[in-house]
Amino acid sequence: MKFGSYRRPSALLSTLLAFATLVTVCSTDECFAASARRKVVIDQDAFGPAGSNLQAILMLLQSPDVEVLGITIPSGDGWRDEEVSHTLRLLEIAQRTEVPVHPGAVLPLLNTQSRTKVWERLYGKLFYKGAWTEVWPAEGAVRRTPYHADPYLVPPSPAGEPRIKPAHESAASFLSRKVREFPGQVTIVAAGPLTNLAMASRLDPEFASLARELVFMGGSFNPVAADNGFAAEYANAPRREFNMRWDPEAASIVLHEPWKKITEVPIDPTTRTFFKPEFIQEVARGQAPFAAYLGRFGQSFPMWDELAVAVWLDPSIVTRSTALLVDVDTSFTAGYGDTLSWSIGEGPGLGERPVTVVFDVDVPKFERMSLDLLKAPTPAH
């Protein structure tokens, strides 16, 4: 166009120019959440009913700016198939049956119950062994079905049996497919053992590099027991945490993968959180379709997995974090499964990745955020 023939742009052209400007601005990380709902795959050992595992899933389902692409399930707190059943029933109650559930690893990569018993004879009893826990303390333990060694047995649930079915595609395949479908956009929020992620990494060497980031709950550094009776076991084993101890080899594999960003929420900040009885009563009075479910099955425990979810949803709740190199001890010694860490630049140089480790959070802000999400009506999706 000649300069002399310049005219005011049409309304359509103005709209197109405005849209182009919006796209340019919102292509940055700062505007990513404003331009589209954040995509997430939840990897969770979803034992239930209710409890920290499933309440963490509910928080993500209740977040209006989050698109839950699917849920992948490994064994951990319970056996995979029982956890899958709890998750499917939760989705029915929450009226979110469009979210697919993909069964993952039944067993750790290398660790076994028999190996764990040998380890205990050598080095002492483990406080908690998830699906391998045969005898529970009389007080202070989560309400759950009796111990069973059959990983494929699904006992009846007091919350009812699901009518919907899990997806046929494996967890590892689904994880790989989603990061390739949305390269650089999918966050993996993992709140159980990392077996599924390790399998995805071995199935697809580009899996981690194609994800947006990894946020995981697990590991332990030097937690301080609170006055609620939890975390006392860390006085003697401050670096031993269940998610890493269930499958140390998987955790080590995942922590060496080329993620763009890794955020770890260890046990340390969770000891100051607690899902109080009054919280259960408050969410039971809420408008969510699962209000009665949480009112009936909710239990008062530290908010382990909810905190990992909240850190991703709103990083402003973090008041202290440190960048460290992190790994997990895979030697079959007294430290098997323990968290290893070094300051940046001081690691052994075997491919350790920098991890942002969260040590302190604004607990009242976190609690209010969690309750608001769990009380709200189901968002449009």
Per-range role (PLM):
Residues A34-E98, T112-S114, E134, A138, ...:
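Active-site histidine-anchored catalytic micro-motif
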Residues P100-P108:
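A short, structured active-site edge motif that brings together acidic residues
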